[in-house]
Design a protein with these regions (language model features):
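N-terminal secretory signal peptides
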Residues: 1-15, 19-31
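C-terminal segment of N-terminal export signals and the immediately downstream linker at the start
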Residues: 9-11, 28-49
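Extracytoplasmic ligand-binding site segments that recognize negatively charged/polar headgroups
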Residues: 54-68, 80-97, 101-231
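A ligand-binding cleft/hinge motif common to bilobed small-molecule-binding domains
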Residues: 112-118, 233-251
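Periplasmic-binding protein-like
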Residues: 134, 147, 175-185, 207-210, 216-217, 286-309, ...
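A bilobed periplasmic-binding-protein/Venus flytrap-type ligand-binding module shared by bacterial periplasmic
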Residues: 150-157, 194-195, 264-278, 294-297
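Extracellular/periplasmic bilobal clamshell ligand-binding domains
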Residues: 312-349
């Protein structure tokens, strides 16, 4: 299977609907207690001898720490988490590999950074991913969590009827200096959004977007905090950021524009993992219904395992009926990264 088939960005609309239908058909399972991961006892024993796991993750702090702690409780193996934006994670991995001193065992990351790091990943067909649809599996990675781009706003500062509902609405002068965006230098997923709006609205969109002077943030968490604190009124964020804030009672709401990007968080094992057995055991746990429930409940994201449950994240089948998901070519985005960043820097200051 090619990398393009492994990622929801590259899947056609009918495949997304079919994937959503697969999860919908499993609805009775979604409310059941997730089954426990059942890894090879020999791998468990070898992993315990290795003593720990080093996880590099671009997922938010909540889900990254939650799955690390759940793994520790289950196997007695501590997990050290390095958490950063996908661009920073990729840079750290490349730097360590170039120096001949790889430090990480396992990886949780989104595209296009996943494709960028593919040369450093090991093929691993975890037994725990057997129930997953083929679209979620590549030889060297497994899709375990999904979320979409949204527009979020502070409900105390912006009335719902006045809030921007689509990407062109952000060009309205009323939002000048009062809205935010994730920084593509730190969070590479912003490049996928940049490609999407360029295709939808033409090259002038980014110039008009920049003229409205968005404030830039390094993570979804930082963006959400800025919105609820009133530092900004509106922001381009992700569905999980809105859900998590709303669940705490914070003054934040959001909307998914008709055209949006469906992002996916993937689990992978490094080819030169210092602790290869612990890496595989962690991957098994992350792929399982048990592990996916932990990471997706903590992250307010959509699981790919039919036995996992994260009700707050929404239903992919229903979303597929009303939304058109962007399908950027990740290899092309990687090849054009410097060009895309130069275009961003030209207009967004």
């Amino acid at each position: 299977m090619t990398r393009e088939h492994a990622s929801p960005f590259a899947l056609r609309r009918r495949s997304l609907i079919r994937m959503g239908a697969t999860l919908a058909a499993a609805a009775p399972l979604l409310h059941a207690r997730p089954g426990a991961a059942a890894s090879d006892p020999k791998i468990v024993e070898a992993a315990r001898k290795e003593g720990s796991v080093s996880l590099y993750s671009s997922a938010s702090t909540g889900p990254s720490n939650a799955i690390a702690e759940a793994f520790r409780k289950k196997y007695g193996i501590p997990v050290t988490v390095y958490r950063a934006g996908s661009a920073d994670v990729a840079t750290r991995v490349q730097t360590e590999e170039a120096a001949g001193r790889p430090q990480a065992d396992a990886l949780i990351i989104e595209e296009p950074a996943l494709t960028l790091l593919q040369p450093f990943l090991a093929a691993y067909d975890s037994p725990e991913r057997a129930p997953l649809a083929p679209e979620y599996k590549a030889p060297d990675s497994t899709l375990i969590r999904m979320y979409v781009s949204q527009i979020g706003w502070n409900t105390q500062m912006v009335k719902a009827e006045a809030a921007p509902k689509d990407w062109p609405d952000l060009l309205d002068p009323r939002w000048k200096g009062r809205f935010g965006s994730l920084d593509p230098h730190v969070t590479a997923t912003t490049l996928a959004w940049q490609v999407m709006v360029g295709q939808l609205y033409g090259p002038d969109y980014l110039a008009k977007f920049g003229a409205n002077r968005p404030k830039l943030y390094a993570s979804t968490n930082a963006m959400s905090q800025a919105i609820v604190s009133g530092e900004i009124e509106v922001g381009i964020t992700n569905s999980f950021g809105v859900i998590q804030m709303a669940e705490t009672g914070a003054p934040m709401a959001g909307v998914t524009p008709k055209h949006t990007v469906l992002f996916g968080g993937n689990i992978a094992v490094f080819a030169k993992a210092p602790r290869p057995n612990a890496a595989r055991l962690f991957c098994d746990f992350a792929c399982s219904a048990e592990g996916q429930t932990v990471v997706n409940v903590a992250g307010a994201t959509i699981p790919t395992h039919p036995g996992a449950s994260a009700p707050a994240a929404g239903n992919l089948a229903e979303m597929s009926k009303v939304h058109v998901f962007s399908q950027p070519d990740h290899k092309r985005i990687i090849a054009d990264t410097q060009k895309l960043l130069a275009e961003w820097e030209k207009h967004v200051k």
